Amino acid sequence: MKKLIHALQLIIILIFVSCTQKINYHQTIKKPVIDVYFGYEIKDNYRWLEDDLSSETEEWVYKQNQTTFKYLNQIPFRKDLKKRLLKLLDYEKITAPFKKGEYTYFYKNSGLQNQSILYRNLDNQEPEIFIDPNKFSIDGTTSLAGVSFSKDASLVAYSISEGGADWRKVIVINTETKELVGDTINNVKFSEISWKSNEGFYYSSYEAPEGSKLSSKTDQHILY
């Protein structure tokens, strides 16, 4: 019994030592930008990181990931922890249903699917797949970011995010035929979709990025 206790103590010590090793953080460059608000100077050293298309920001993110995964990969119980979490998460999940037009919609995940699927059914018929985000891209990095139905539920506008980006694309389809309606809207960011009756909807978008420069101007549009 004492040997077992000593062995457990040794394992705990080794885990503690391995997880408390000094981390050599990548130093973030300071590029001061001064703004004046009501006579007060406000210094921002990291404004340059807001340019998410610049090579400098890309390099910064790369080095941050290097540091992070170097630490995570040396945790001895990481694989066991992942295995346990996957086991706990592997169960069917169904959201509360909601009514749009004649159909009842709900999201369902069979267990370990990357994204929940949007289903619908009519009366007591067998549910059918309406939107399956898992088929948006081969590598599974394109996600469903939002869904908004027109007032009569004849159309639905849904937004997608590629690679976890804040930028969105908005796609409109006919709910009965599932055929595309109009053009895909690009450069949507931090925006909800608000329908104006069944004529169209309002949304906010940024100007298309030019080179590595992003515009902070937000335009309001209505799509017909």
In which residue ranges do the predicted regions lie?
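Bacterial Sec-dependent N-terminal signal peptides
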Residues: 1-23
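Beta-propeller folds
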Residues: 19-224
